[in-house]
Swiss-Prot record:
<keyword id="KW-0488">Methylation</keyword>
<keyword id="KW-0449">Lipoprotein</keyword>
<dbReference type="InterPro" id="IPR051863">
    <property type="entry name" value="HIPP"/>
</dbReference>
<feature type="compositionally biased region" description="Basic and acidic residues">
    <location>
        <begin position="73"/>
        <end position="85"/>
    </location>
</feature>
<feature type="domain" description="HMA">
    <location>
        <begin position="3"/>
        <end position="70"/>
    </location>
</feature>
<dbReference type="GO" id="GO:0046872">
    <property type="term" value="F:metal ion binding"/>
</dbReference>
<feature type="propeptide" description="Removed in mature form">
    <location>
        <begin position="137"/>
        <end position="139"/>
    </location>
</feature>
<keyword id="KW-0479">Metal-binding</keyword>
<feature type="region of interest" description="Disordered">
    <location>
        <begin position="70"/>
        <end position="94"/>
    </location>
</feature>
<comment type="similarity">
    <text>Belongs to the HIPP family.</text>
</comment>
<feature type="lipid moiety-binding region" description="S-farnesyl cysteine">
    <location>
        <position position="136"/>
    </location>
</feature>
<comment type="function">
    <text>Probable heavy-metal-binding protein.</text>
</comment>
<keyword id="KW-0636">Prenylation</keyword>
<protein>
    <recommendedName>
        <fullName>Heavy metal-associated isoprenylated plant protein 13</fullName>
    </recommendedName>
</protein>
<dbReference type="InterPro" id="IPR006121">
    <property type="entry name" value="HMA_dom"/>
</dbReference>
<feature type="modified residue" description="Cysteine methyl ester">
    <location>
        <position position="136"/>
    </location>
</feature>
Amino acid sequence: MPPMKAVLQLSIHEERIRKKAFVTVSRCPGVTSITMDDKTGKMTVVGEVDVPVIVMKLRKLCNTELVSVEVVKPPEKKPEPEKPAPPKPAPAPAKPAEIVAWPVQMNNPYQYNPAYANSYYQPYGNSRFVTDESNCVIM
């Protein structure tokens, strides 16, 4: 989604609601900058934002109308003239790689074996008494 510039008309009459509007818009993901003109009540939001979501959230605070939405074009970069590369220094003669001997880790004298994790109880033995009586009383 390209960066957008949205101009919103808000009807704000109190400082408290103005602050809530700023906080609500600033919490939306992708907002780059927020400006507001107190005389006209227009708020300008710039960034990669979902404009209808911002309008829905602001309508819970005050009367909000969407004035315009524009795609912000990135500033054009002027091509810089190429500078001549400085001459490369002569390569240094190859040195043999240093061998570093790391100390061998010995057992810590205060290292204890971990305790067994007996955090459960053994279940009681369940048994069923099944009687296999094949004699029939009715017949």
